[in-house]
């Protein structure tokens, strides 16, 4: 989701991590690379490593964190201690397979008190989240859809669109809402695969491009190839900051959380758990991270340390979050093959 390139193992070194040269513990984090690592280092790890006399290092696996954790389990050689910004579908899938460590009852309760129950799962908490939102080019459209039902209404809005060609659970959540499911029910209602694919089939003739990355979203909207589409919220606001005239509609969008979690069987699970507790309890540090990356952080107090211009663009801002539909990740963890296959067939058909 962050568009980082390549899979590169990066040890940031003792000095960079801010730990003592006498450190004997190395905390290994499966990350995304690029600006995500840089922000995590600056906002969290410099202080955390120094206070706990350890060294943190990243192994970057953008978009393939799930595969890496599965491979480590298959080989019975767990190399990572924690994962940074693991996408929701992958996180719930790994947890369902017993490959992410469950939170203790007391830790979960503490996180819920600090962050709010909606941000906390049995295995961690959301971090680096965004929204899959309706975006239209106001230079090319006088009136924009204001709900997902309108976005799917091709008679009212016949313009060509772009839509996600990846992340099926996010895509079908927009279809559920367009078909009339309240956004408060998407997280707990089992997905009717045939019904959502039928809804998507009605939209497909008006989809000109199925995007595969954030960079492609921006390229298509910047070029004017389509005036309307579903975009990642952070990518849309980046275009606006560059002068592209876009309207962002949060209403009925799909919430796309990522998660911090501890890998089950990690060699340094205690230190990894301590890192999660550090992040959750340091809203100012979260604000630093969000200001660098422009993606959301879980502690609501972090908004106090952000310019309003940035805070208003984050998915976890209460004004935005209450307008988003959360996918049923628990269902997806048990039915990912079924949905992924159905979505691939939809794209090819």
Residue ranges and their predicted role:
Residues 18-20:
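Bacterial signal peptide processing site
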Residues 13-16:
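C-terminal motif of bacterial Sec signal peptides marking the signal peptidase cleavage site
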Residues 23-92:
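Early extracytoplasmic/lumenal segment of secretory-pathway proteins
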Residues 32-41, 78-225:
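Extracytoplasmic ligand-binding site segments that recognize negatively charged/polar headgroups
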Residues 263-323:
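Mature extracytoplasmic/periplasmic domains
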